[in-house]
Design a protein with these regions (language model features):
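Signature of short aromatic-glycine-proline-rich micro-motifs recurring in repeat-based ectodomains
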Residues: 1, 33-55, 102-121
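Short loop/turn segments immediately following beta-strands, especially the blade-tip
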Residues: 16-27, 76-88, 136-143
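Structural signal for beta-propeller blades
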Residues: 11-13, 72-74, 131-133
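Short loop/turn segments immediately following the C-termini of beta-strands
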Residues: 8-9, 67-69, 128-129
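Blade-level signature of beta-propeller repeat domains, shared across WD40, Kelch, NHL, RCC1
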Residues: 110-143
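Extended hydrophobic/aromatic segments used for targeting, binding, or gating
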Residues: 75-118
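Hard-cation-handling environments
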Residues: 1-3, 8-19, 24, 56
């Protein structure tokens, strides 16, 4: 049995083994974002946040999906083998940070909530400031 722990402060996540109470080394999500992608640079003590997480199993693989608040994105990792976490993909959520019309005049907050159906590949991201929802479907769900 495992648990997924996301750390908003340093922008990382870990897998906790609930039988041995040991955790994997932290994975910093910002390191897997494409060049030029929006990251949180407001403070040196705060990184791009894996805000909300969901876990989905498909064909013997376990995937961790996380909403990245300041990056307006959903990022996916294959965590089937907790000792060998593999970056899978990242997709933009909402209208995009460069076009965010946040009432506060700041575009630093995007994808806040996340919901994933456990079997059909549908994922929803609640985009906080713009008041929208993005629907994703996994490639395997469209096959």
């Amino acid at each position: 049995d495992y648990a997924l722990i996301s750390n908003e402060r340093n922008g990382s996540f870990q897998i906790l083994d609930l039988t041995t109470f040991t955790a994997t080394d932290p994975v910093t999500v910002e390191n897997d974002l494409p060049d030029g992608w929006k990251v949180d640079g407001r403070k040196s003590t705060k990184r791009t946040e894996p805000e909300e997480a969901a876990v989905v199993e498909k064909d013997g693989h376990i995937y961790a999906l996380m909403a990245l608040q300041e990056s307006h994105a959903v990022i996916v990792y294959d965590v089937t083998d907790p000792a060998n976490i593999i970056f899978d993909s990242v997709s933009e959520a909402g209208i995009g940070w460069e076009a965010d019309n946040a009432p506060e005049g700041s575009s630093d907050i995007g994808s806040e909530g996340l919901g994933a159906h456990p079997t059909n590949g549908m994922v929803f991201s609640a985009n906080e400031r713009e008041g929208s929802v993005t629907m994703f479907s996994a490639a395997w769900a469209r096959e």
